[in-house]
Amino acid sequence: MREWFKLSHPEGSGFFYAPTGGKMNRVNTKTMIRTRDMTKIGMLSVIGFILMYFQLPLSFVAPPFMKLDISDLPVLMGAFTMGPVFGIIIAALKNILALIFKGTMTAGVGELSNFIISSTFAFVASYIYRNHRTYKGAIIALTAGVISMTILAMASNYLVVFPLYAKVMPMDAIIAMGSAITPKITGLFTMMIYSVLPFNLIKGFTTSAVMMLVYKKISPLFKN
């Protein structure tokens, strides 16, 4: 089967020689690779940060502080073209940029949640795709990434993120926001089931759909 996506990050390092003035000058290609990768990481991190400004509230399923965006798209792009670890780095940098330039209304809790979810999505999807580089493999990889990030989102929000939110806003007020969406939300656990779960599925599959549409056109810019 033909390859649909292509992981093109070079592995290892070596040397080549270029003649100058009758002499052979050794150039460390590992340094060149690192410089090129840092440039790509910087570009994708900035794009991800900019996309965080374009948010869509999902008032039918999520409280006001949970909004849909596609800022995970550059994270996925980096993970698929350079490797899973690079996706995690880009996810971290885009949230650091958001904290510095955009500020936070959640004392950094929202950015922490975004990093956990974004990096999990990119890592799982790109790791699976490395061994299944076909169109079908891409769909399977992205679906696995969405499911993984949704499960982790529920666990991290239940155990860490929402308890931290409660230090900024009373937990009763947070639950009340959920209850206004559906009376089925009566506590933190039901908030995870009826709000966090569908929200992350919608976000993940929306980002995946955009990724499938634009990857082949945009990825050459980030390949070697």
Predicted feature locations:
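Loop-helix junctions at membrane interfaces
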Residues: R2-F5, S13-N224
